[in-house]
């Protein structure tokens, strides 16, 4: 029986794919059979993640990119196509968050977050999406957030950007539906990573988030891999414009104790 979840023979690019959830997704796609280029701004992280992908017996390239720099994304595409001839899968996982009250937030901070999280996703979709449309095949997955749907304090710019990521996925899905390219999003719940451990561990904010998660714990980054593999595989060939929430029941919940 054919494994409709296999990514054998596919080439994937994961933008922001060298740390946190992005790194886990890069390695998860490699486990599913794809050759994976995990790219970010930091060469040391790119090299480390590439070495791990190679230990999974998959091919890769060691290339940095910056979603705020269109030329760097274009260079990434050119190098990837030269090496692999095609790009089948794109995951947009690059993102930043800055915590401040909306009233005191500098406009420059708003611009930084929106340019990285939303406009950066648009740039990537435009550049890699054009290649996919020319080939008549592609799977794009944009990483959204619980903040795409609910408000948490002091992250207005982040919430606005991630709401936009969901809307962008829907818009592109409709535009590209008849041209062989699906565009979806994944909205992770509260996942413990090195970047947010200080916020989640033994703080009132962390306890509040934990209380609102019905499964009673924070997510492990590997628990998001299945959602990504599904959306990138032939199993999801009729799924586009969808946001798959992986949140331990957070959005379904009221207050749980």
Question: Would you name each region that the model predicts?
Answer:
Residues 11, 18-19:
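Conserved glycine-rich cofactor-binding loop
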Residues 125, 161, 169:
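Active-site helix of classical SDR
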Residues 101-102, 106-114, 140, 209:
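Substrate-binding pocket helix/loop in short-chain dehydrogenase/reductase
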Residues 145:
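Residue(s) in the substrate-gating loop at a strand-loop-helix junction
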């Amino acid at each position: 029986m054919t494994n409709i979840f296999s990514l054998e023979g596919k080439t994937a690019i994961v933008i922001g794919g060298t740390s946190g959830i992005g790194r886990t997704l890069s390695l998860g796609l490699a486990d599913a059979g794809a050759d994976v280029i995990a790219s970010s701004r930091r060469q040391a992280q790119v090299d480390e993640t590439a070495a791990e992908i190679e230990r999974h017996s998959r091919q890769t390239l060691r290339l940095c990119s910056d979603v705020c720099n269109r030329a760097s994304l274009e260079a990434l595409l050119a190098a990837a196509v030269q090496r692999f001839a095609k790009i089948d899968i794109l995951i947009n996982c690059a993102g930043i968050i800055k915590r401040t009250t909306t009233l005191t937030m500098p406009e420059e901070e708003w611009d930084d977050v929106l340019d990285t999280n939303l406009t950066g996703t648009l740039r990537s979709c435009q550049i890699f999406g054009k290649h996919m449309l020319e080939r008549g095949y592609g799977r794009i997955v944009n990483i959204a957030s619980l903040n795409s749907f609910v408000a948490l304090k002091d992250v207005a710019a982040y919430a606005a950007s991630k709401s936009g990521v969901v809307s962008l996925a829907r818009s592109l899905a409709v535009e590209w539906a008849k041209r062989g390219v699906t565009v979806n999003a994944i909205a992770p719940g509260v996942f413990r990573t090195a970047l947010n451990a200080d916020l989640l561990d033994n703080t009132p904010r962390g306890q509040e988030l934990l209380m609102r998660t019905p499964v009673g714990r924070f997510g492990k980054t590997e628990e998001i891999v299945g959602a990504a593999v599904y959306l990138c595989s032939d199993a999801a060939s009729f799924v586009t414009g969808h946001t798959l929430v992986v949140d331990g029941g957070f959005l379904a919940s009221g207050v749980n104790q």
